[in-house]
Amino acid sequence: MTSLLDLLAVPPALLALGEPTHGESAFLQIRNETFMSLAVQGYRSIALESDRAAGLIANEFVQGSTAVTLDRALTEGFSHGFGGAPANRDLLLRMREWNAGRPASERLTFHGFDAPLEIEGAPSPRPYLIRTCEFLGLDRSTEIDDLIGDEARWSDTAAIWEPGRSIGRSADAQRLRVIADELLIELYLNAPRLAEGWPAAFVQAMSAVAVLRYHAAAAAPLEREERFARLAGVRDALMAENLLQIRSAEAHRGPTLVFAHNTHLQRQSSTMTMAGKDVSWAGAGAIVASLLNDRYAVIVGSLGASPALGIGAPARSTYEGRLQRGSMLPRYVRAAEIPAAERRTHDHRYFPLDQATIDHADAVLHIPTGVDAAMLADRILALPGVEQIVPNEENGSPEGASGDRFFYVGPDRRQPFATIVDHDVPGFDDASQLDRPGVFRLNLDLGRAEFERLFGFPPKAFEEHRQEFDFARLDTVVPHPGYALYGFGSIVMPGPHLLPEIDRLLAIAHGRAVDRHERAARRAADQPD
């Protein structure tokens, strides 16, 4: 792909990369490649659409802490369920690997920039206030607990739509806002003696402020449509505040990449029609762009098709359809080079491009298609003479192979040249963690020569090198954890940017299968009747 920075007129301090939907892994996988490439060019931090306070745990892992395991970093270090995305696992591991042995000035930092809330509700501020008090050595837990009262008052999702049920403007909530403000002052007063750990404590205090602000907004007596826009706007304002604070903290180390949904990063206001009424609000990107000017750049994400989400190919007359014409590989395109086109039909699964989004963007990342197991199977079946067997009870296959796909050339079914699997075999083949939702693996018969060219050692030496590989990492050609001895390699969830390499390796594996079939045919022809 074209280098991202080459498309920008001015090198930004905050580079935003958007996705039009949550759920298409290809955007996260390309984000990972982009960030690691930017790290080589001086970027030192990444901020994701995830709870900023929770992100402190993920960053502990990234910094090499032995107190935070990878599992904990993923379960507690992300909000919105994003820790379950396989690409986010890879991001944390790659950042930790980069940081190993590097000085502070070159280390990568992980940030969340969302507030600890969802659009439909927010928690109580208690844990954030208590953690701030503990850092300061203050005991205000009794006072805070009395004001919090029943946690159910804060977690009532109906309060988002019924202001009379919200606790946000009660006397207790008002007093808690005063306490949060007092704790912020105490943090600054005590900064000289508590410099170590101060930034994390500040994040905890600001998280308390954020949820209290959101609860107050939920208590405003507004009509339903205005209410939604107000709450969405408050959330984006909190995101913008976090981004500006993150940039202030990171300014001396290098630029920051921020990754989120397009609607949070675009320069123009967000709009929505609810019950026939148009509502709008300034997103985080609109706020930050107005304050940072050309120090902020935004690349919006564009999606052609997504097998995983059930989104088909776009019409040729749409923005996405026209972007498909130049290449079926992911690419960055200057926004100014994209001609006018039709807006794709609205689909609740993702946000299509429109002229306003393009006009306010610096560039577009277009992904023509995501990749799933069925799409790869079709690619393999398009090769000459290929047949597929999917094991099941009807054809007498063993239970452990049910649902896998085996690809052969000719009638010999003893050795497939490629397989696609989506589940572990406990005790034998579980290093790829294929039991994660949506995860699959492509396995290919590379042969000894290609195997050695890729990995630097012959198949017979695999066990000596096993510990060098992370078999669960996406987008990486590795020896097959179970069949490397026979020259097999594998790739977990290859993204669309790897399709050319997949085609190259498929050609090798398919060619080997064709040769075997032709040799067998010649031997059969030489046999006497």
Please give the residue ranges for each predicted region.
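Structured catalytic-domain cores with a bias toward divalent-metal coordination
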Residues: 1-374
